[in-house]
Amino acid sequence: MAIQSKYSNTQVESIIAELLAVLEKHQAPTDLSLMALGNCVTHLLQNKVPAESRKVVTEQFAKALSQSVKTN
C-alpha cells in the first residue's frame, strides 16, 4: 500500500504469504477473511497506537487502502 516503506519487499511479502496461508488453511471465504483481517487491524490500532494518534493513523490507513484498490 505504501509508496515508500522502511521495510523490505521481502519482509512484507513474507508476512502477507503467511497471513494468506492461514486464511487458505481455514478455507475462509472472502467475507470471513476481510472480517478477520479487519478485526486484526482494529486490534493493532487499539493496542499498538497511542490513543491521541489513532484517528490520524486510522484515516491514513483507510486512505491508503482505498487508493490501493482503485481502478482507473
From Swiss-Prot:
Pfam families: DUF1414. It comes from the Bacteria. HAMAP family: UPF0352. NCBIfam families: PRK13689.1. Belongs to the UPF0352 family. This is UPF0352 protein Shal_2512.
